[in-house]
Amino acid sequence: MNKNTFEPGLSLLRQPVAPLVSMVQFLYLTGPFATVAEVVGEMPEPIETELAIYEHPVALLREYLEFLQPLESLKSEQEIGEDVVDEQGEPVDRMTAVSALVMQQVLTAELEKINSRLCGPCNCTLCCTGPSAGMSQEFFEIPLAPREIDLFDVDRCDHADSRAHRARDEEELYCDGRPFYRRRSPGLFHWQNGWSLILPRGAQCPNLEAGSGRCRVYAQRPEVCRRPQIFPYMLERLDEPRAGSPVYRLRQTLLAVVDCPYVRELQDDIARYAAAAELHLAWKENKS
């Protein structure tokens, strides 16, 4: 596949915002600035880093200004409302926690734009179909927020038994006397950890147009569908809150799904993006 096909997304991938965010944080904490917006407004133009030249860094940073606001809590001592722990479960220092929470939000927003531009030219339905006959998986799961479930006109499974299970529990949920994934058509399931659309073997998303492969609800598509197949894993949300506050484990990883055509094609560029964000890069297969 010609790399020119990916130019709209590739141009963004090659100008990662993470180095600029790190500059803003440093300048804000070491300078006489009352707000992060002041720092952004005084950034020089252009800015050249080891990996990229940013002709208009101020305009770029302003796209993410709302996600940078928590940095101001580092000067005000305002509570951030989330706890972050390391791999051993020990709390990290305040600056590490705030920096990670900010970067997770920034990278999530940035990669939504990048993935959306890279995905279109591939005419790929990898994320929209269940496993094929030769794959080891029995089903494909698309996690959904409660507000997204009405996008799918399929059968629902929502009862005490389903809400006591998770899709990948060793002790499987049974529906109508058989494992939940042994069905011919997609279904919505309300699990212990939320809702998801289950695509069994050979099934496809009900919003996928036959023949064209277009998504009927593209403009309103679920959040998880907006972020294939490169996504930030700065933080992993844990199930056990502390005193009612969300708890996250620091991961500092970028995940890239190698089943995806553009991920396979752009591995070097993705590696440079991860390096710019100072993230460990993990390649993984979603289906096999």
What are these model-derived regions, one by one?
Residues M1-S288:
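Short loop/turn segments that flank or connect secondary-structure elements
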